Amino acid sequence: MALRWGIVSAGLISSDFTTVLGTLPRSEHQVVAVAARDLSRAKEFARKHDIPKAYGSYEELAKDPNVEVAYIGTQHPQHKAAVLLCLAAGKAVLCEKPMGVNAAEVREMVAEARSRGLFLMEAIWTRFFPAIEALRAALSQGTLGELRVARAEFGKNFTHIPRSVDWAQAGGGLLDLGIYCIQFISMVFGGQKPEKISAVGRRYETGVDDTVTVLLQYPGGIHGSFTCSISAQLSNMAFVSGTKGIGQILDPCWCPTELVLKGEHKEFPLPPAPSKEFNFTNGAGMAYEAKHVRECLRKGLKESPVIPLAESELLADILEEIRKAIGVTFPQDTR
């Protein structure tokens, strides 16, 4: 049976995800509805992607009995309301990262999903790329020995993009780019809670974080660090080092196709998406997370074993603590 998707928001990321679903077997994935706050945009999106239903409100999509799972592709500050709306209507939910602007928002969504017995997952698509799965397998086999340190960098000049510098929309580097770095460090260290977090950073003139460097100390004397920036070009690589060697995820580390493990270079081609155009780098790789959601739902799972809800809560806690350390608050923090 095909998994029936409803797309919440007709923006660029939603377009890429819908394009990807169209490359997968129709017997497994079908997009049955799209909603935008402007009906004309929803209709235009539906025409482009050949979707049977277009709604001018998220409420209408949530009420559509044909929708099994909702993909939330709105801006960060709108995630919570959209997720809670879809959960209240009995839908499974895949929500773009970051799930919430702060830890309180994430906890509220997680509690709602658990109380209703519904599937909820944060769309950290990176974790489903074969290059990352290969690294995880190597770590679990002890290929790198005892782990000591992990590091990640993600930075580009996004200051010309209004959303990236918009304080009201919780812009800045941490929530958009830093989450990729911290999820990598959290992944290689097994989702442990850091014992100590220290951060330094500069703010952009609008009040969002511009460039931030973070040091995380974990139990057992291991540590991770990352730098993220919306104004500086960084290496956009990630690595983990142990007593027997180093594993490197090459640029683009947030959607990687290359892994160097103890000097051995491995390539993992993207899934085929002939004649398809994407708005974001390696957009075809969204297929991996879509397949994972279907597998979880077919097994009757309420959360992903790869991105468990407790880890989504932990990532939100860490990001919030970093923001406090560098003095960045958003309007959503006072609600």
UniProtKB/Swiss-Prot annotation:
Catalytic activity: (1R,2R)-1,2-dihydrobenzene-1,2-diol + NADP(+) = catechol + NADPH + H(+); D-xylose + NADP(+) = D-xylono-1,5-lactone + NADPH + H(+)
Enzyme Commission number(s): 1.3.1.20, 1.1.1.179
Tissue expression per record: Liver and kidney.
Gene Ontology terms for molecular function: D-xylose 1-dehydrogenase (NADP+) activity; nucleotide binding; trans-1,2-dihydrobenzene-1,2-diol dehydrogenase activity
Annotated control of activity: Strongly inhibited by isoascorbic acid, 4-hydroxyacetophenone and 4-chloromercuriphenylsulphonate. Stimulated by various salts.
GO BP annotations listed: D-xylose catabolic process
Site for May play an important role in coenzyme binding, residues: Y71, H79, K97
Residues with site note (May play an important role in catalytic activity): Y180
InterPro entries: Gfo/Idh/MocA-like_OxRdtase_N, Gfo/Idh/MocA_domain, GFO_IDH_MocA-like_dom, NAD(P)-bd_dom_sf
Keywords: NADP, Oxidoreductase
Chain positions of site May play an important role for the adaptation of the alcohol substrate into the binding site: D176
This protein's record includes keyword Oxidoreductase: yes
Name of the protein in its database record: Trans-1,2-dihydrobenzene-1,2-diol dehydrogenase
Species this chain originates from: Canis lupus familiaris
First and last residue of the signal peptide: none
Top-rank lineage group of the source organism: Eukaryota
Family to which this protein belongs: Belongs to the Gfo/Idh/MocA family.
Subunit structure: Homodimer.
